Amino acid sequence: MAGKSPLINLNNGVKMPALGLGVFAASAEETASAIASAISSGYRLIDTARSYNNEAQVGEGIRNSGVDRAEMFVTTKLFNCDYGYERALRAFDESLGRLGLDYVDLYLLHWPTKDWNATIQSWKAAEKILGDGRARAIGVCNFLEDQLDELIAASDVVPAVNQIELHPYFAQKPLLAKNRALGIVTEAWSPIGGAINDGDGDNHGGRKHPLTDPVITTIAEAHGRSAAQVILRWHFQNDVVAIPKSVNPERIAKNIDVFDFALSDAEMAQLDELDTGVRIGPDPRDVDTSSFAEFV
């Protein structure tokens, strides 16, 4: 079957699906099964990373899918421990080897690090990989506004994508606007979001979750959709690429079934008002080349 997701244009003319499957923290067995379910459900964007330890299963799943490689959009990422020009080039070769592919569609720097020179040198390596045709586009993850400015000032290529934590409870409106102004597509990791402290000890032990938030569930009921589908549609209408992670075949299928309904301006505004400004993941200013060593 054909891919279900609309395509968006990156700043170098490459087309990228507007929704894909993330495989963070999925085991090898879970990844293989999830890839099969996703592709059969119409996904064409798969997002992995060196630190996820499942690149091999992603590549195997794509090869076994029966879908032409040219129809797929594969993203992987350079991890912090491999930063530096030569190390980044070697790490990319290793990722390609694990994937069993000749090229990736998008190669991302996973984090900005306190060792800014290593970050810049890694980006220079990504520029070479792009120039050699082994990545169709390059980008970054978790870069803040000033970090984007510094990177661009020291580089020849403007990132095509900035993949960031973004969900209704952490909407990052200023960074989203910055990305747009620079011609950078925003991609959301953890697009559904997770539980946050809400200050009400009588409500879920002082925590709430987007999937049970009454604002979201009320909108979902009005459309006959799930809360997750409403959130993913909110991303799409904000021109944000979402990569929800799931290993459940039913949820995988539902997550991409969001392109045949629309949220009203009032509903979009209601969802926007849920922003707490509270980050669930790490602060991009506190990450170094040795951060998250337990993942590799």
From Swiss-Prot:
First-tier enzyme category under EC: oxidoreductase
InterPro entries the UniProt entry points to: AKR (IPR020471), Aldo/ket_reductase_CS (IPR018170), NADP_OxRdtase_dom (IPR023210), NADP_OxRdtase_dom_sf (IPR036812)
Keyword list, A-Z: Alkaloid metabolism, NADP, Oxidoreductase, Plasmid
One GO molecular-function entry: aldo-keto reductase (NADPH) activity
Pathway membership, UniProt: Alkaloid degradation; codeine degradation; Alkaloid degradation; morphine degradation
Catalysed reactions, as listed in the record: morphine + NAD(+) = morphinone + NADH + H(+); morphine + NADP(+) = morphinone + NADPH + H(+)
PROSITE patterns, per database record: ALDOKETO_REDUCTASE_1, ALDOKETO_REDUCTASE_3
GO terms under biological process: codeine catabolic process; morphine catabolic process
Active site: Y52
Enzyme nomenclature, EC number: 1.1.1.218
Residues at which NADP(+) binds: G13, V14, K15, M16, P17, A18, L19, G20, L21, G22
Residues holding substrate: H110
PANTHER family in the cross-refs: 2,5-DIKETO-D-GLUCONIC ACID REDUCTASE (PTHR43827), NADP-DEPENDENT OXIDOREDUCTASE DOMAIN-CONTAINING PROTEIN (PTHR43827:SF3)
Quaternary structure and interacting proteins, as annotated: Monomer.
The family this protein is said to belong to: Belongs to the aldo/keto reductase family.
Protein name: Morphine 6-dehydrogenase
Source organism of this protein record: Pseudomonas putida
